[in-house]
Amino acid sequence: MRLGLSMLFCLGEPFLTAIKCLDKIGVDHIEIVDEGLHALNSRRVSMLKRTFSGKGISLSVHAPFADINIASTSPTIRRAVMKRLKKSMEFSAQLNPECWVFHPGIRSAVSDALRNLDWEINLKSTHELLREAEKYGLRITVENVPEPFPFLLKKVKEFERFYEALGEDGLNLGITFDVGHANINGEINEFIKRFGSKIVHIHVHDNNGDFDAHLGVGFGSINWVEVISAVKKINYRGALVVESKGNIGESIQTLKKLLK
């Protein structure tokens, strides 16, 4: 397993400042967050290539997530969302990332009245994203998200239903397993056991089981010894991407000790 770091912790910094900071931290993997001040464009893609090329650092890209809902029941909004995500794929593919991570759709105020419509739109959008990914040879993954947010995919049972409905397309869709989110949902071990073969990317951050605080590793209630043991049992070979908002150095050192 390799240690990685998400740019989430420096999302409020100018892009150039963030890149210079990352270049000094000393991890094997960087996750670019295509959002806000760091939204990808041709200039930023070129900058990333110059900075990390030839250094043995692998990359992944987290798709835009602010105001993004692939299950929107408004055709106009959904078209805009899909256009933004497809543009993200286009720029991301130029970086040759290990994967591109996206969030599942969100229930809306009319979900109860329009039974299963948002679920069906979520499936439709996922199929569409998979088709787009094929154009670029891009591996895409869906992330498990936490309570209490009204996402359509949070728990194991929801993911089981989702993959069954995807059919053969589900074979091409991996999972980015977010340990912190699973802790809030009370399903860390269950999720790893059930979807071990689908997990191709892992986000690590801590919390106390009540709020998605994105604390440093070891600063919450998660038993990281058990987590690393469970991840090793599924022969995971990808990156452990620190997605904390602070205590970055401490998180990396804690993980290094656990992986010895």
Residue ranges and their predicted role:
Residues 54, 75-174:
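Active-site acidic/histidine proton-transfer and metal-coordination neighborhood
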Residues 1-2, 11-12, 16-23, 98, ...:
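Histidine-acidic metal/acid-base catalytic patches
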Residues 28-29, 58, 98, 139, ...:
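Residue-level detector of anion-binding/catalytic polar loops
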